Amino acid sequence: MQTLDLEALAAHRGSLFGAMPGGQPSQKAFESRVHDALSRLDPARPVVVEAESSKIGARLVPPSLWAAMAAAPVIEIVAPVEARVAHTVATYADIAADPAALDLALSRLPRHHARATISEWRAMAARGALSDLARQLIEVHYDPAYRRTGADRGRPVLDRLVLEDLSPAALAIAAQGLAAGLDRARDPA
């Protein structure tokens, strides 16, 4: 299965909490990385790309790539909130380990939420209640924002993966199944 990891190329996880050590490349360097990655892919085979906004951190996805992504069919991944919470806590362990960085990221949310909500989230972070914080962010911030943008509305759903957990092992098994399914769809013989 061919993948294009835009977050790795942009050195950013694509959210307010997405900054990575070392900072982001310049826009030109990001576009060069994207071009290099695309040039190594087989254009006759499908490419799987995580749904991203047109901006990853401070970097803009090249418009032609963004248009292709916006028109592409969708592979939905569905998981219980508890699994998503555990995955989020593990994925963002680096920012959680830096209380000042976590507080700064949370302080940037007030334009989206009431001050009391932000204060509650900051208090959760300060006392190390990271699972509670992740659950709140998923249920109150990210899921509603995703529903509001409707990024996938009207796009065909190529596959729907229902996962009970998002551990590295479960994700590897899901990726293998997805790759096999994409190969079958491409070569139905």
Walk through the language-model features, giving the residues of each.
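Short hydrophobic alpha-helical runs that function as membrane-insertion/retention elements
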Residues: 4, 75-76
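Conserved NTP phosphate-binding and transfer environment spanning the P-loop NTPase/kinase superfamily
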Residues: 69-72, 78-189
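Conserved nucleotide-sensing/catalytic segment adjacent to the nucleotide-binding pocket
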Residues: 2-68
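Short, well-ordered beta-strand core segments
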Residues: 47, 74-75
